[in-house]
């Protein structure tokens, strides 16, 4: 994402590398919170005798480390690590590309708040098509109930395709579309607005630029998380449900699934896992923006721009 509206986007290869570095940096720091978030989101109702139940984020962290070992907090990380390069490259490259497209379409010389939200939403939809198979694998590996079924990422893919067919790898596409549209519109929309409100960084002052990016990215990540958590909850449920021929899954489409969760578990259930999610994606959004901007600035200097 360019620091200003007149800066020409770099070629896709540079976007890809910068997005990959930013994404992998964020995932290595924040991944355990994603595991906790998924475990909490997959819980339905109240505790059942004989089944592990988590009373919030810290209880979940404690029980995972105590009962399964610290390494379990990084179970399933191979899928997101492999996903981060194309995912983050698509996020930022699509945002820059769609931004230029919409400015040209509407005859706008500079980015506006409305265009920032529209651009972010479209970039989120674009990104969704890249991430669905990786998200599906990650969810299956993170769920404790299916931990013994799979021996790593490739085994998950093999067993899903064998049991449910190749199209099952895109199970949850619709809910993922909604999740990413909401998060990206909130993220990039807030970044635009917060940057406009912050004191402008002095030319060449990297510490001020980093400060502004960290603040804008963290606020943007928090706003995106507030907007998209209900869709993330139902996405986790949809992707953790194996397809059975002739049987309609309980969680199938995003908005009906939202209604089902609200009816059976109450509105608060739509925000299960919110604390670990916002603690990850709030600061994580800041990390993403700081690293991405830093790598892109490095490439611009290297190219003499």
Swiss-Prot record:
Q: What happens when the gene is disrupted?
A: Leads to fluffy and albino colonies, and reduced conidia formation, when all 6 genes ctpA to ctpF are deleted.
Q: Which UniProt keywords apply?
A: Membrane, Mitochondrion, Mitochondrion inner membrane, Repeat, Translocase, Transmembrane, Transmembrane helix, Transport
Which EC number applies?
Answer: 7.-.-.-
Q: Which reaction does it catalyse?
A: citrate(in) + H(+)(in) = citrate(out) + H(+)(out)
> According to its record, what are the GO cellular component terms?
mitochondrial inner membrane
Q: Which SUPFAM superfamilies match?
A: Mitochondrial carrier (SSF103506)
Quick one: where is this thing mainly located?
Answer: mitochondrion
Parts of the chain that traverse the membrane: 16-36, 78-98, 118-137, 176-196, 208-228, 270-291
Which top EC class is named for this enzyme in its record? translocase
One Pfam match, by short name? Mito_carr
The stretches annotated as Solcar repeats are 10-101, 111-197, 211-298
A biological process from GO? transmembrane transport
Query: Where in or outside the cell is it found?
Result: Mitochondrion inner membrane
Q: Which PROSITE patterns match?
A: SOLCAR
What is the membrane topology noted in the UniProt record heading this document? Multi-pass membrane protein
Known function: Mitochondrial transporter that mediates citrate export from mitochondria to cytoplasm. Both ctpA, ctpB, and ctpD play important roles in citric acid transport across the mitochondrial membrane and function in a redundant manner.
Family stated for the protein in its record:
Belongs to the mitochondrial carrier (TC 2.A.29) family.
The protein depicted here goes by the name Mitochondrial citrate transporter D
């Amino acid at each position: 994402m360019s620091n200003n509206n007149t800066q020409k986007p770099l070629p896709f290869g540079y976007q890809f590398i910068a997005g990959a570095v930013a994404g992998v940096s964020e995932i290595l720091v924040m991944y355990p919170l994603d595991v906790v978030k998924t475990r909490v989101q997959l819980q339905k109702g109240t505790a059942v005798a004989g089944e592990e139940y988590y009373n919030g984020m810290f209880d979940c962290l404690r029980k995972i480390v105590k009962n399964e070992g610290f390494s379990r907090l990084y179970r399933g990380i191979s899928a997101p690590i492999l996903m981060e390069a194309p995912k983050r490259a698509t996020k930022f490259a699509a945002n820059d590309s769609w931004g230029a497209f919409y400015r040209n379409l509407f005859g706008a010389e500079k980015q506006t708040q409305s265009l920032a939200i529209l651009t972010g939403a479209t970039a989120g939809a674009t990104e969704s098509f890249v991430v669905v198979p990786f998200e599906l694998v990650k969810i299956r590996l993170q769920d404790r109930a299916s931990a013994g079924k799979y021996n790593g990422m490739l085994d998950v893919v093999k067993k899903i395709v064998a049991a449910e067919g190749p199209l099952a790898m895109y199970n949850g596409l619709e809910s993922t579309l909604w999740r990413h549209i909401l998060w990206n519109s909130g993220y990039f929309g807030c970044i635009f607005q917060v940057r406009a409100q912050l004191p402008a960084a002095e030319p060449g002052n990297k510490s001020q630029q980093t400060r502004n990016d960290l603040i804008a990215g963290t606020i943007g990540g928090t706003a995106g998380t507030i907007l998209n958590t209900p869709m993330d909850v139902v996405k986790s449920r949809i992707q953790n449900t194996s397809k059975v021929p002739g049987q309609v899954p309980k969680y199938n489409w995003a908005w009906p699934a939202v209604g089902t969760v609200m009816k059976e578990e109450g509105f608060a259930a739509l925000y299960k896992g919110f604390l670990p999610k916002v603690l990850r994606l709030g600061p994580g959004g800041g990390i993403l923006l700081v690293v991405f901007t830093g790598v892109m600035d490095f490439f611009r200097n290297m190219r003499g721009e």
